[in-house]
From Swiss-Prot:
Signal peptide: none
GO cellular-component term (any): chloroplast
PROSITE patterns: RIBOSOMAL_L22
Cellular compartments annotated: Plastid, Chloroplast
NCBIfam families for the chain: rplV_bact
Designated name of the protein: Large ribosomal subunit protein uL22c
Subunit structure: Part of the 50S ribosomal subunit.
Primary gene name: rpl22
Job of this protein: This protein binds specifically to 23S rRNA.
Organism, as annotated: Arabidopsis thaliana
Length: 160
């Protein structure tokens, strides 16, 4: 079962997978390889790794990217896995019947995986704006974000 969780941040998108039947230790082994990488690079790594835990994580990363493109309109080329965490879930306990009426306990561990994708294009635009402000030709008069001509040009604002 995959649940999606949203946060109020404008550049982050969450996807949460709960009760995935895999131990948290085995899932962390895969998650540590993709943390901090771009979306496309993470998908390639997950496709080529030979572990069974890669497939549910692959689906979760793909789902988070689909949330980003559908809900917030982000491009998949600008997405980076900023946060990926694995928490231990419930342990399902079963009894396996054995010879002579005995039984052995079987423990099936689960985990909860959270993937956070972040859009880096916002930060690139912000850095470009800061570089523009640091240019020597840019004086304090040019740094005003609101255009003075918009309010003083007449048009709709002066007519009543």
């Amino acid at each position: 079962m995959i649940k999606k969780r949203k946060k109020k941040s404008y550049t982050e998108v969450y996807a949460l997978g709960q009760y995935i039947s895999m131990s948290a230790h085995k899932a962390r082994r895969v998650i540590d390889q993709i943390r901090g990488r771009s979306y496309e690079e993470a998908l390639m790594i997950l496709e080529l790794m030979p572990y069974r835990g890669c497939y549910p994580i692959f689906k979760l990363v793909y789902s988070a990217a689909a949330n980003a493109s559908h809900n917030k309109g982000f491009k998949e080329t600008n997405l980076v896995i900023s946060k990926a965490e694995v928490n231990q879930g419930n342990t399902v306990k079963k009894l396996k019947p054995r010879a002579r009426g005995r039984s052995y306990p079987i423990k099936r561990s689960t985990c909860h995986i959270t993937i956070v994708l972040e859009d880096i294009s916002f930060y690139q635009q912000y850095e470009e704006y800061l570089m523009y402000l640091k240019k020597p030709g840019c004086s304090n008069e040019n740094r005003n974000l609101t255009c003075y001509d918009t309010y003083s040009s007449g048009g709709l604002w002066d007519k009543k």
